[in-house]
């Protein structure tokens, strides 16, 4: 489809972000694992196209499909706050290939203590990078904070896994298979708030509908971080809860007993199937651009906004991160 696209608003969402289904479609688009394989030249091209489109300088003959593809690549690889290119492993589009490998091996190698400790460490290293990459970039994070967050989350995950492994020794085998999920959930409750503690201490930047900065709110930061924690646990839950049940049944089959070497690859593949759908679903649970009533903000910030804008500003907006 060709035509004059100079007035096309490339930043306008293709799907309604006020609805869950619209957000899921949006994240299906930008978390597409295939975008991980886009070359640096393609990503630079996408950024150039998006920036030119924002200025109304779309080259004549450009097709709508090209603009939409450029925006897809841009959203998958560049940070929404800074516009900087994100590292490949930390992108949400890498959640499927990266997550399926780590989750599959966590679920497969859960019996021995060294394996539990190693794979929980690998998982928390991956999570720490993802959390940092997808943070709200308006709130800087120091190296000390990142190191403390990483150490605390890894310790929490390993302690939970080791403790529950010891506790479930006499429990049915299926219960032991759920230990990795308990460790992941516990670590997410620590890792994300710790990685973004600066937002909880100093507040997150909140804006009005026209993107004018209004101040910093700790309450808004707490809401955004809580939503991210819920999303991350939701992302992992179906695969890490249902897959052990599936594998428990499959491993009883005569064929599976003969090809034990295929158990790990099968778990990795099935994890990928779960994550392919759960990454966009979990990311779409809450709007990325959060809306919060002014009445919920801290009294000082609320009074400042009302004194300056009166009743014109009833809601504030902020990027909660992913």
UniProtKB/Swiss-Prot annotation:
Any GO molecular function: monoatomic ion transmembrane transporter activity
A cellular-component GO term for this protein: mitochondrial outer membrane
Catalysed reaction, written as an equation: L-serine(in) = L-serine(out)
Membrane disposition: Multi-pass membrane protein
Tissue expression from the record: Expressed in brain, heart, kidney, spleen, thymus, liver, stomach and skin.
Modified positions (N-acetylmethionine) in chain numbering: 1
Location in the cell: Mitochondrion inner membrane; Mitochondrion outer membrane
A Gene Ontology BP annotation from the UniProt entry: amino acid transport
Membrane-spanning parts: 99-119, 147-167, 174-194, 223-243, 266-286
Alphabetic keyword roster: Acetylation, Amino-acid transport, Membrane, Mitochondrion, Mitochondrion inner membrane, Mitochondrion outer membrane, Transmembrane, Transmembrane helix, Transport
InterPro entries: Mtc
Purpose: Mitochondrial amino-acid transporter that mediates transport of serine into mitochondria. Involved in mitochondrial iron homeostasis by regulating heme biosynthesis.
Entry's family note: Belongs to the sideroflexin family.
NCBIfam families reported for this sequence: mtc
UniProt protein name: Sideroflexin-2
Gene (name only): Sfxn2
């Amino acid at each position: 489809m060709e035509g004059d696209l100079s007035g096309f608003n490339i930043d306008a969402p293709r799907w309604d972000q006020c609805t869950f289904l619209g957000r899921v479609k949006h994240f299906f688009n930008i978390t597409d694992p295939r975008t991980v394989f886009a070359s640096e030249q393609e990503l630079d091209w996408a950024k150039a196209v998006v920036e030119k489109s924002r200025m109304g300088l779309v080259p004549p003959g450009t097709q709508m499909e090209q603009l939409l593809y450029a925006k897809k690549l841009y959203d998958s690889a560049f940070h929404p706050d800074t516009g900087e290119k994100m590292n490949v492993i930390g992108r949400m589009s890498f959640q499927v290939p990266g997550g399926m490998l780590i989750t599959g091996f966590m679920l497969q190698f859960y019996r021995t203590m060294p394996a539990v400790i190693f794979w929980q460490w690998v998982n928390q290293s991956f999570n720490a990078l993802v959390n940092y990459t997808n943070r709200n970039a308006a709130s800087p994070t120091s190296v000390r904070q990142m190191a403390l967050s990483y150490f605390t989350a890894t310790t929490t995950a390993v302690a939970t896994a080791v403790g529950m492994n010891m506790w479930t020794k006499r429990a049915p085998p299926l219960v032991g298979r759920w230990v990795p999920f308990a460790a992941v959930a516990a670590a997410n409750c620590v890792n994300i708030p710790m990685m973004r503690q600066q937002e909880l201490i100093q507040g997150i930047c909140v804006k009005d509908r026209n993107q004018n900065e209004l101040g910093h709110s700790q309450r808004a930061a707490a809401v955004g971080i809580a939503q991210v924690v819920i999303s991350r646990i939701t992302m992992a839950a179906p695969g890490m809860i249902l897959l052990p049940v599936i594998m428990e049944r499959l491993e009883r089959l005569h064929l599976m007993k003969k090809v034990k070497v295929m158990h790990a690859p099968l778990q990795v593949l099935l994890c990928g199937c779960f994550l392919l759908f759960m990454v966009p679903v979990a990311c779409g649970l809450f709007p990325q651009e959060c809306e919060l009533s002014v009445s919920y903000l801290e009294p000082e910030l609320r009074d400042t906004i009302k004194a300056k804008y009166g009743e014109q500003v009833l809601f504030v907006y902020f990027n909660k991160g992913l």
